[in-house]
């Protein structure tokens, strides 16, 4: 019973200090949460010196926290013409 009340109080304090913004919490580090996509919805936690923020919705699917999409995009890089030419260059350097 006491644990439930304590948990409810902690959640209430966290929610009270949390602000959801579209653009108010943007910064260089917050934008990096989305990788190459841009963030459309930030979740900000107000701290004493400033704000700690995280992106909760990216504008595109390219989200670093979605493992399948990242793995797919990394695997797709192996088959680009630039990567093939770099592989050929590496093979040529190995022969020397």
UniProtKB/Swiss-Prot annotation:
Hemocytes. One of its GO terms (cellular component) is extracellular region. Residues 1-20 form the signal peptide. Keywords: Antibiotic, Antimicrobial, Disulfide bond, Secreted, Signal. InterPro entries: Myticin_preproprotein. Contains four disulfide bonds. This is Myticin-A. It is found in: Secreted. One of its GO terms (biological process) is defense response to bacterium.
